[in-house]
Structures are given as structure tokens and as C-alpha cells.
């Protein structure tokens, strides 16, 4: 009987030694996978059915401006995001452009032809997030917009007001002005 017990103990010890050495290793493998999806939302800027839109202001006079930062005229515009991926729940828009100030709040007049307006710039106010002026430095704003349209044609709308403002102490001079900003969508 002792021989049977001894042989069982030796067999069990051998199996335990073999099975623990199976789990001892110095390396392993981790596999990663995912999916890259194409354009997450369709973009429509100011009824243009395009990613590029134009905001045209009403004519103003130099007398419409009374000092640095005063608004001569304003125009509302919107950026719509349609048919967003159902996984997207929040969106942010960031803006970049050439500005006249260190705070990145005033787009400069890029019209340089002879006779173009001077002392004028553009600001943009975010109507979705209160009365905050848009920064044109590419930074992501703190305010996100919830997506209303996961997978359907109901647009998620970002509403803005563009303002023509006096830049500096001298009143704007008569002439054409122009400016542009680039925006980027951040999906959350």
C-alpha cells in the first residue's frame, strides 16, 4: 500500500512540476484591433450645401463706428452637421485664422488691394454657448454640443453671429474688406 501511495505522490509531483513550467514565460502577445470610419458627419455651412460658406454683410459707413471694438453691422450664420455616426454623442468646433490681436478674437482684414477698407476686422460670437467670442487659435472650446442626429438627416446646428468691428482708435475707411477662418470638427 505504501508503494501505491509513494508512486501517486511521485506522479503527482511530476505533473505539478510540468504544469507549472507551462505557465512560466518571459514574453507574450497582445493583439489590438479597431475600426477607422470615414467622414463622421456631413457638413453644410450657411445653406451652401458645402463645407465652405460665405457671410455677406450689409454696407456700413465710417460714422457707424464709434471706437475700438464697436460693431458696425452683424450677420447670423450657421454650421450644420448632418448624418453623424451613431457613436458620436458630442461635437466641438475649433476655428483658426489670422488675427489682429494677441487674444485671437479679431480676424484681420485680408483685402489688400488699393482702396480697400482699413481699421476694420471681424469677430464671431457663439450663440450656442452664450455670448462668448470665438477664439481663432485652434483651441477646443470648453462647451460641447450634444449630437441630435445620430445617423439621420436632422442637423446638429452651431449658430454664430459675425460682427464687423472697428480695429484701433481711427474709424474704418471706405473700401472692401474680407477675411476667412478655417474650422475643424472634434468628435467626442
Regions found by a protein language model. Name each.
Residues 2-4, 20-188:
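Mature extracellular/passenger domains of Gram-negative fimbrial/pilin and adhesin proteins
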Residues 12-22:
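Hydrophobic h-region of N-terminal signal peptides that target proteins for export
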Residues 9-13, 109-111:
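Generic low-complexity, intrinsically disordered sequence content enriched
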Residues 1-11:
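Bacterial Sec-dependent N-terminal signal peptides
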Amino acid at each position: 500500500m505504501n508503494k501505491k501511495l509513494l508512486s501517486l505522490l511521485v506522479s503527482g509531483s511530476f505533473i505539478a512540476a510540468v504544469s507549472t513550467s507551462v505557465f512560466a514565460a518571459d514574453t507574450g502577445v497582445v493583439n489590438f484591433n479597431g475600426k477607422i470610419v470615414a467622414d463622421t458627419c456631413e457638413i453644410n455651412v450657411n445653406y451652401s450645401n458645402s463645407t465652405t460658406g460665405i457671410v455677406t454683410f450689409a454696407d456700413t459707413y465710417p460714422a457707424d463706428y464709434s471706437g475700438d471694438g464697436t460693431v458696425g453691422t452683424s450677420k447670423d450664420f450657421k454650421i450644420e452637421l448632418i448624418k453623424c455616426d451613431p457613436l458620436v454623442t458630442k461635437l466641438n468646433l475649433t476655428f483658426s485664422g489670422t488675427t489682429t490681436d494677441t487674444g485671437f478674437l479679431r480676424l484681420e482684414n485680408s483685402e489688400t488691394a488699393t482702396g480697400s477698407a482699413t481699421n476694420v476686422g471681424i469677430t464671431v460670437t457663439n450663440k450656442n454657448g452664450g455670448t462668448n467670442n470665438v477664439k481663432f487659435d485652434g483651441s477646443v472650446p470648453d462647451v460641447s454640443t450634444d449630437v441630435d442626429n445620430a445617423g439621420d438627416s436632422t442637423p446638429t446646428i452651431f449658430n454664430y453671429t459675425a460682427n464687423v468691428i472697428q480695429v484701433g482708435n481711427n474709424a474704418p475707411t471706405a473700401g472692401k474688406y474680407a477675411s476667412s477662418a478655417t474650422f475643424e470638427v472634434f468628435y467626442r
